[in-house]
């Protein structure tokens, strides 16, 4: 059965059929780099990395492009506030973004284009729109004639006549129509600018992605993705620009991930209710944050709380402990016959995982299958005799499916001393709070990793087992 994808354009699930058999062209709108990312910003790279990994797992060759907006009003404002060069600010936050997303297990894009490196393509794109009558110049600014594109509003399901003037699009008396949006901004004194047929200036936000999609992926792509907040006006405007320029559909499938809310309100820098990703990585680990994100369906909103994050941490540790137990049992097991029923049962979990993930990349249900696999593994570990072949089959499947999600479940490498000390301290705190179940869980986790604890009057001592 084909993968089913919820297409924001048609507002329904559809079988995924790429333009070219076996190949997928995918574009994800990247960050405007003027600050460190918060966990809401971290969700798109994580979920679309998961989707990219799953498509590759299902045999597709994926060409993945994600951009950096490295010149923008916000970047200029921050640079002015700090008294720094615009490009220095952008470069600093690009590097910070790369560090955070790498820690979160996000694979490098095949192409990471920057606006400042795509200027000639952006200018050429606008020139074509102007020649076709879809764009006009006013005092060095260039605008898009929104009403001229008869399908405007098809992604966000809005009639052009129902759109409120200036509600989401900046009102400007130089526009022919209040709904027209800017393609090129005339230079302001002291701001960074580029030469163009309309004088010095810089591009508007929406045209940048249209130009980069065309440059790296062509006129029509398979998947265009981003946060739910980008659906209108950003993605709507991208469609208008690109389809008027090429005369072809921009993308066949549009994917949008849900928000992360804090106290039931969307997390956003403008609201000041953000939790920085690097802070969460330091406090809880990048792997826990990624697992937390993937424990919900990518289109569903997540109401963030420390309790939910702690639950994700316990869930991930349960899976890792199950795998560690399998790995340690391997050393004392032998090969013998009659294991086919177990091997067949293990293989069924692969089929279940694929079935869940084929349904619009449902990582939450995929993780539920992993928990069922862990239960089955623990049941097998209670057998009097355990077969190396069966144990290895369990381990291999955990590695395989964990890899699809970008989560390491087999922690065969030794825990670092600092991690051991942190877990022992957490166990001490749990015992003080009379949370003996958590204390026992930590002892079991350390035991599975070959760490032996000894409670003494002077405190807890530990050593690595042989």
Swiss-Prot record:
Gene3D superfamilies in UniProt: Cysteine-tRNA ligase, C-terminal anti-codon recognition domain, HUPs
Residue numbers carrying Phosphoserine: 270
Note describing how the cofactor binds: Binds 1 zinc ion per subunit.
Record: residues binding ATP: 269
Cofactor dependence: Zn(2+)
GO molecular function: ATP binding; cysteine-tRNA ligase activity; zinc ion binding
Catalytic activity, as annotated: tRNA(Cys) + L-cysteine + ATP = L-cysteinyl-tRNA(Cys) + AMP + diphosphate
EC number(s) from the headed UniProt entry: 6.1.1.16
Pfam families xref list: CysS_C (PF23493), DALR_2 (PF09190), tRNA-synt_1e (PF01406)
GO biological process entries: cysteinyl-tRNA aminoacylation
Domain of life of the organism encoding this protein: Bacteria
Subunit structure: Monomer.
Protein family (similarity comment): Belongs to the class-I aminoacyl-tRNA synthetase family.
Protein's recorded name: Cysteine--tRNA ligase
UniProt source species: Halalkalibacterium halodurans (strain ATCC BAA-125 / DSM 18197 / FERM 7344 / JCM 9153 / C-125)
